[in-house]
Regions:
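Alpha-helical metal-binding/catalytic segments enriched in His/Glu/Asp
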Residues: 111-115
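Extended beta-strand/beta-hairpin segments
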Residues: 2-109, 119-159
Length: 159
């Protein structure tokens, strides 16, 4: 946590305890911390380097459970405030038990979340208020690629 503060509370905010630091929220984003992060990255590009990782365990049929705990931020190991768990399964038509989103649905969620968060943070950095963001994503799959039945058919999403 202290390591994380080093990267996110640069400049004049660096010496202020988090509890007494002013917070200016725009789109739910702490703009003071965001500005400090931007300045820290400008001053030291190494601060921008992150490595995220998960530990996955197959639990039968199409079910998987991944644990998210630690990551590297600016070359230093840090961890989430709590251990996070991601569950995946396949729908019945793909021989699963349908107890969770399947891996390709998780990919769509990750893409939508990444694009939306990026847009909201960039807007906040520019002083633009956003009232609402909604998106719909879809992807086409052809099981012949996954099953190895047609070498010309791409495995995974088609585009």
């Amino acid at each position: 946590m202290a390591t994380e503060r080093r990267f996110l509370n640069q400049a004049k905010e660096k010496t202020m305890p988090v509890e007494t630091r002013r917070i200016a929220l725009l789109n739910g984003v702490d703009v003071i911390r965001l500005t400090g992060t931007i300045e820290a990255v400008k001053a030291d590009p190494q601060v921008a380097c992150f490595k995220f990782r998960i530990q996955n365990r197959w639990s039968g049929c199409g079910q998987n459970r991944s644990q998210v705990q630690q990551f590297s931020a600016g070359g230093r190991e840090t961890q989430h405030k709590t251990n996070l768990t991601l569950e995946a399964d396949e729908p019945d038509v793909l021989l699963g038990t349908d107890k969770g989103a399947n891996p390709v649905e998780h990919l769509l969620h990750a893409l939508a979340s990444c694009v939306t968060t990026s847009m909201v943070y960039h807007a906040a950095a520019r002083g633009i208020a956003i009232e609402e963001v909604e998106s719909s994503l879809e992807g086409d799959l052809d099981l012949r690629g996954f099953l190895g039945l047609a070498p010309s058919v791409r495995k995974g999403y088609q585009q």
